[in-house]
């Protein structure tokens, strides 16, 4: 199975998982959208990473889908979100851990096609250790990010 097939399958599984749990059934309905990779409009976010909104709006009630492109060696300190999310690794390898402190021993390497969950209010952290990584996030807003202070 090709990497593209794995990523497509993983994205479908993530969407079906959210739908089955009722997460996509609440809030404003999605508008019809058909977007090719060339049509994505990437915007530099506050952390220097690039983001593109595919559907919905994370700041509003209802389903949303966006992608983030992490630069090589980007580390995101522990943080959490008020909503639950399912994340698919579209390209690259992302190292993901759960907990309130950034702990390299808790990281798991997730290559393209992998999926991880971000339960509501569950602290987690990521590292694009080996190079650029693109993820796709599916959630049910409204959403936000709360950073966790790190012990020295």
Map each language-model feature to its residues.
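Glycine- and acidic-residue-biased ligand/ion/polar-headgroup-sensing regions
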Residues: 71-74, 80-101
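Short acidic-glycine-tyrosine-enriched beta hairpin
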Residues: 100-121
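Bacterial N-terminal signal peptides that target proteins for export
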Residues: 1-11
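Short beta-strand His + acidic residue motifs that chelate non-heme Fe in jelly-roll/DSBH
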Residues: 76-78, 96-97, 118, 123-129
């Amino acid at each position: 199975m090709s990497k593209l097939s794995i990523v497509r399958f993983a994205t479908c599984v993530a969407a079906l998982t959210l739908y089955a749990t009722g997460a996509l059934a609440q809030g404003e309905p999605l508008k019809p959208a058909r977007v090719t990779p060339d049509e994505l409009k990437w915007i530099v976010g506050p952390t220097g990473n690039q983001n593109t909104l595919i559907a919905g709006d994370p700041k509003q009630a209802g389903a949303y889908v966006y992608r983030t492109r992490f630069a090589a060696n980007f580390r995101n300190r522990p943080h959490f979100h008020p909503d639950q999310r399912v994340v698919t690794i579209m390209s690259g390898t992302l190292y993901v851990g759960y907990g309130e402190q950034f702990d390299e021993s808790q990281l798991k390497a997730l290559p393209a096609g992998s999926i991880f969950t971000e339960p509501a209010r569950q602290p987690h952290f990521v590292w694009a250790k080996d190079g650029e990584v693109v993820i796709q996030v599916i959630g049910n807003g409204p959403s936000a990010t709360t950073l966790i202070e790190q012990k020295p």
